[in-house]
Amino acid sequence: MTSPPLPSFEALLARDDVIWMGQNTTHLEPAPEVLEALAESTRRHEFQVYAPSAGFTELRELIVADLELPGFDAWVLDGAVAGLHHLCMTLAPRVSRLITSDPGWPWPGRFMSVAGIPVTALPVYRQPRRLLSAAQIAEVIEPRSLIYLIDPLNPLGSSYDAVELAEIVGVARASESYLIHDATYRHFADNHTLAARLYPERTFTTYSFSKWLGLAGLRVGAVVAAPELLADVMAVPANPLGAGIQAQRAAIAGLQVRDRWLGVLRDTNRRNLGAVEQVVAHTGAGSVVVPQSQANFLAIDITDTPWHSDALCTAILDQTGVFIRPGTYQSPLFGDHFVKVSTSVPPDWADQFCAAWRSVAAR
């Protein structure tokens, strides 16, 4: 079954009636300190000058402290995806294969494919834990592979425990492989272990401000690694003129009020996750793939409904203005079976989604 494609982001931005619940972005009222940092940077016309290539020292130190990785270093970039692209392009001549998951985030695989590196996307949708396992990876790994772990996993919301992560690290170490630990959604998880603590010699951690702090449009993130490892891959940076100064000022301000902000953010996110789970259960239209998601989104399986994911997302947007994401964006194998709903949004947005689910999906 085919359906009209969803409108472009530019077309959606031109509308004033869209409820943004499809990009995993945070839409709560920002912390006043973040807004003031942006305003002050603008008043000082800092947008007229370049930032330090690696980012402001204060920001780099705050990122490392947030991750609790003493002795590590951070390189600030214009978004975590820029860091992923740089890592993929820099590591491509050194690695034999990229190992990732389906569902997952497709762009690292695309980056590596452009570089001529084979990509293996292992299926996890029907795995008991909805995650890559060490046994799966061991079946396909080659010497000097690159393993890409999204944790918590976008788009399902599952997260690795310390034992699972240690087993994967063991496979990586035995094959002298690199590991990218995409920690974009770490701040939403109840417990989170960083692979860098177990395998510092070949692990890169990617860090984003788009989700937990809501700075998606400002484009600021980082790559964190042991100093020698980071210096090696950043010897020729993709952007030697640095990430935007205004974005970095906002990120610094956010990290300075991190604990207070996360309390509000996590409480709101949990409330909205619960509301979405409840409406899915009460309507009987689909089922939540990972209950109690560890991220700011969840996936709803619609296999046993009359809907296909693209058609359902289009219908909900057209009829209610609520924008959610079809699974086809993130899973060639299973994408038609699920939709993804972002939850770090104002509670009334989540309630509007629930009304949309009752009126469209469950009809």
Show where each model-derived region lies.
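PLP-dependent aminotransferase-like
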Residues: 89-149
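Short, conserved charged micro-motifs
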Residues: 306-312, 348-353
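N-terminal small-domain helix-loop-helix segment of the aminotransferase-like
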Residues: 1-82, 86, 363
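Conserved glycine-rich beta-strand-loop-beta hairpin in the small C-terminal domain of fold type I
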Residues: 268-277, 288-302
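A short helix->loop->beta-strand "cap" motif at the edges of active sites that frequently abuts
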Residues: 96, 117, 174-178, 201
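Conserved core segment of the aminotransferase class I/II
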Residues: 205-270
